């Protein structure tokens, strides 16, 4: 693999605001600087609207089949070869829940050893730049805008009648940036599924992982765990080691069958108790469920290092996939890992404590409830008013998720569409055009009704306990207004877009 001396690395521009008007360039005394806001506006124009998404779900098989060939054509236009991608020493991770957290742990561990890391994830919470990180930080507005227009102009010129959709474009942009910066390892999180996901254009990753499987995106991936597992295992590549988190028998059988057909060495990650840690650890991402992701990260890191011949101090390179001695530096990296919006606590000076978690599947919501219950005790908030700020999106069913929150003693639910403000700014990072306003409003009403029906005495619930607003900022203001007379604890969950909006409004979205 390529290990670049620090002095030869390309320096990233410092983060700076590049606000401008309709023109995509802002003139400075030295040169024209591409406008970040204009790049975001054009990017948002690539989002699929609600009608298109419905069509995609109906025609999913035909459209999935052409997804990867299209990606290869775009990459060819950008002069990015399969060899260029292979040289990024990619760690490719799919799964339903925990894949982002596992990737974050991997990135933190490898970065702690001086490697230049590239991390591509989704979705973003506040700023779209969060999806493309180098050395643990989002790329600057300047770099994002410069590289955006490089990619956009080429693809617009050569594929004007067939522009890539939002996620696909960002994937191309991430590849472009990481190849240009010559990162030493790319941690690549799958978008949806795996088999037909545009990240699967990578031919030779160093190692693959499949985190916990659950029911999500069922209109695309299928209604059975075995069907979902088939898609997730689509990232397996011949002779490339792959790991999977413990799962059901039916899903495991599919993972094993796909591994055999692709000649893939496949291993189940061991429980965290199989490792010998140099000291007691508290992972930087809270929650007992994160230990499964820690185990996945440890296996991915060691397998990657073995494949690349990169020494990990205190960790013998080995093809053994059992637990191993975890040295102090690795414990530190696990604890220093940060992944906002997942099991996060935000306390304000306005008598409000927010528990935020982007859980949006049954298993993740159950884990969220267990984490929240533990934190309520730790924070000594058992006797304060508890509000649930909840919304779920796409084809997710509120009643299958919200029932897990019943033990928390919530006395009021607030729901809203995942738009930050009532009017949509198409140049804003938070703009979400994938669902119509009416659909989101209807889903918000379904959420509050599902909460009511989950209670033992739903007939006693008053209208004041069930509030629906037109946007996140209105819901946030309503919640904050109640803090004038009492202490409040708010659980924000169901959607990462919702969590990101609250972090933005609370001033924690930087």
Curated annotation (Swiss-Prot):
A monovalent cation. Belongs to the folylpolyglutamate synthase family. It catalyses: (6S)-5,6,7,8-tetrahydrofolyl-(gamma-L-Glu)(n) + L-glutamate + ATP = (6S)-5,6,7,8-tetrahydrofolyl-(gamma-L-Glu)(n+1) + ADP + phosphate + H(+). The keyword Heme does not apply. This is Putative folylpolyglutamate synthase. Gene3D superfamilies: Mur ligase, C-terminal domain (3.90.190.20), Mur-like, catalytic domain (3.40.1190.10). Coiled coil: none annotated. Mg(2+) 2 binds at residue 217.
